[in-house]
Amino acid sequence: MSGESISTFQFLGLTFNTTNLISGLVSALIVFCVVFALSRNLKLKPTGKQNILEWIVDFTNGILRDSVDEEEEKNFGLYAFTLFLFIFVSNQIGLFLQIAWNDVSYLRSPTADPIVTLTLSLITMMLAHYSGVAKFGFKKYFEKTYLSPFKVWLPIGVFTEFIDFLTLGLRIYGVIFAGEMLLKMIGGIAFSGGIVNMIVAIPLALIWQGFSVFLGSIQAFVFVTLTSVYISHKVEDE
């Protein structure tokens, strides 16, 4: 472990994680700036930076298309697009922009904290449940989700929902947290044992950093894919 702690503050008797707030805001700001820059001067025939934006939109829509029908793809397209970009950027921040002072982290990957990833998981679940109720009505949706194929299925259905919530959020947290910890360990080796350790550690850090970029990208894809599958279970007719 790195020995670093997080920054917090108190408000109305509640403790807030300053590190997560700053990191999440920075990630959101980066996403906003990138999308804003790519979406200027849109043309009917895309060229240059507009191609990049449309490729990302097509990519996330394609993920949805594999799980839901065309109508639901339109309903959740913006959510999938935003979710993918936010998670992708959040996964990479800790590799390039970590900021700490006096062993207190102020900027790191937001997704390296289970509170953040479980919150994203909860948002997805709430959106899926809301959409299911809006489409089928509460009674039919409840029966479809928790009482099918048998009424005694209710405890298993509730337990399954809880497991889905945990696995969706904790999978990405485990990968990103482990990646950051390993980078910190390699960095500690580089600066604690002289020039020989540094010569060995720096190439290892670069290799692992490149691999972590790949893992972060894959995890963003996996999260959105699982999100689309989860949503499809709630809004699609069986």
UniProtKB/Swiss-Prot annotation:
Disulfide bond residue pairs: none
Transmembrane domains' residue ranges: 18-38, 76-96, 114-134, 150-170, 188-208, 211-231
Keyword Transferase attached: no
Main subcellular localisation: membrane
Entry GO terms, CC: plasma membrane; proton-transporting ATP synthase complex
GO BP terms, alphabetized: proton motive force-driven plasma membrane ATP synthesis
Membrane topology summary: Multi-pass membrane protein
Keyword Mitochondrion: no
Compartments where found: Cell membrane
Keyword line: ATP synthesis, Cell membrane, CF(0), Hydrogen ion transport, Ion transport, Membrane, Transmembrane, Transmembrane helix, Transport
Gene3D superfamilies: ATP synthase, F0 complex, subunit A
Cited InterPro entries: ATP_syn_F0_a_bact/chloroplast, ATP_synth_F0_asu, F0_ATP_A_sf
Gene Ontology molecular function: any one: proton-transporting ATP synthase activity, rotational mechanism
Any Pfam family hit: ATP-synt_A
Subunit structure: F-type ATPases have 2 components, CF(1) - the catalytic core - and CF(0) - the membrane proton channel. CF(1) has five subunits: alpha(3), beta(3), gamma(1), delta(1), epsilon(1). CF(0) has three main subunits: a(1), b(2) and c(9-12). The alpha and beta chains form an alternating ring which encloses part of the gamma chain. CF(1) is attached to CF(0) by a central stalk formed by the gamma and epsilon chains, while a peripheral stalk is formed by the delta and b chains.
Role description: Key component of the proton channel; it plays a direct role in the translocation of protons across the membrane.
Record-stated family: Belongs to the ATPase A chain family.
Annotated protein name in UniProt: ATP synthase subunit a
